[in-house]
């Protein structure tokens, strides 16, 4: 893989925090941390009509949210690839919804899910499939 070298400036406190993290985790390559962080930042800030993949992570009270959750999932079934459902307790569930579609539509789906009564957490993790060069 060809690479470009760049130089960056960090506030001292952020630099110290980074160095402490690298030592604690035994990370041999500082560049890899920046590559991952930059890809994540770029993914989160892509245009709204690009096709992306993602996971919507939900934590919810199934007694309050299940019916509305199912309705919205059926409304967006063209964007939903798969779901994984976990029972955490008698009341609380976690759901991971794998999605693909235009970013703006997936953000809209995540926002709608987050408005359902009983949803405690709704978070869209965006992934853009990078080709290794």
Swiss-Prot record:
It holds the Pfam family RHH_1. One of its GO terms (molecular function) is nickel cation binding. The keyword Cell inner membrane does not apply. GO terms for biological process: regulation of DNA-templated transcription; response to nickel cation. Binds 1 nickel ion per subunit. Its cofactor is Ni(2+). Transmembrane segments: none annotated. Keywords: DNA-binding, Metal-binding, Nickel, Transcription, Transcription regulation. Belongs to the transcriptional regulatory CopG/NikR family. This is Putative nickel-responsive regulator.
């Amino acid at each position: 893989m060809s690479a470009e070298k760049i130089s960056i400036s960090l506030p001292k406190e952020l630099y110290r925090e980074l160095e402490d993290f690298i030592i604690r985790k035994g990370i041999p390559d500082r560049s890899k941390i920046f590559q991952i962080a930059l890809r994540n930042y770029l993914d989160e800030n892509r245009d709204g009509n690009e096709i992306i993949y993602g996971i919507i992570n939900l934590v919810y009270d199934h007694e309050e949210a299940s019916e509305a959750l199912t309705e919205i999932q059926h409304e967006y079934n063209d964007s939903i690839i798969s779901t994984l459902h976990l029972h955490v307790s008698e009341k609380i569930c976690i759901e991971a919804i794998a999605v693909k579609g235009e970013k703006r539509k997936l953000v809209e789906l995540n926002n709608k899910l987050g408005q359902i009564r009983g949803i405690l957490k709704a978070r869209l993790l965006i992934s853009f499939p990078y080709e290794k060069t």
